[in-house]
Amino acid sequence: MKAWLVVNSFMNSDKFKHLYEMLSLAFNKRGVSLDIKTASDISLEVNKKIDEKVDFIIFWDKDIYLAQRLEEQGYKLFNSAKAVELCDNKILMYQALATANIRIPRTFIAPKTFEGLNYSKRDFVNGVIKQIGLPLVIKEAYGSFGEQVYLANSLEEANKIIDQIGYKDFLMQEYIASSKGKDIRINVVGNKAIVSMLRENKNDFRSNISNGGTGAKFEPKQEYIDLALKATKALGLDFAGVDVMFGPNDEPIICELNSNPQFASTLQYTGVNLAEVIADYILNNL
């Protein structure tokens, strides 16, 4: 059996290489030849038929255009192009979660603007602050590892952040103070919660391990697991890292979902190798 692991052309750090090696080893152990491919390796030409035969593709990139082209030409992707798109764009993600009646923070989408105009009118920011108060969480539509997520403690800080964002799409959310610097990463594969990890960061409102947080194996309440599974299903994901916050009354609130989670830290803190679980799931669902 032959498959591809499609990865980003420009992300070549040791962290990513280690993850790719974990996946390759898991599939090789199961008799699958897993070739690592980038967009350049496959084809950049829109009107060219991609004719190499593979049994399936693990799509570990966020190149939605490539994912769509591959599916249009008959390739089976894990995760699907649509699922990756919904996770990659936070605006689409929260809209889909809201449509499915899944508990998320109160979320407001900034009006559309364009390069050169930027967000020249800021009355909408005042309107949001009047409704949900301060601090205000500001998230760019695209971003990973918490790097495009900001906390504004005043209108002045919010305006400075929006100045930096320029004309890029962003959203605003209520700040969940009860979950400051902590959340639960629930790793889901095939609509099953495989292992969960409590992530904490005492020096930041974001819990990301890449920002200095730590992790520990954790057994969440069933309602947290149920919400994570419901959210995963709503976005059509085969596997995902689901980040769940602690609400003010200890109720679960979805922070976000990741279609290609960096699970080396999960192995480090829980001893569970998600590459093995993903490999078994895919081979049982072809």
Question: Where do the language-model regions lie?
Answer:
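Protein kinase-like catalytic core scaffold
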Residues: 136, 194-195, 240, 253
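Phosphate-binding site of ATP-dependent enzymes
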Residues: 145-235
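Anionic group-transfer/hydrolysis microenvironments
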Residues: 108, 141, 175-176, 187, ...
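C-terminal active-site "lid" helix and adjoining low-complexity regulatory extension at the edge
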Residues: 233, 247-286
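Active-site nucleotide/adenylate-binding loops and adjacent lid/helix of ATP-dependent enzymes
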Residues: 2-9, 84-181, 222
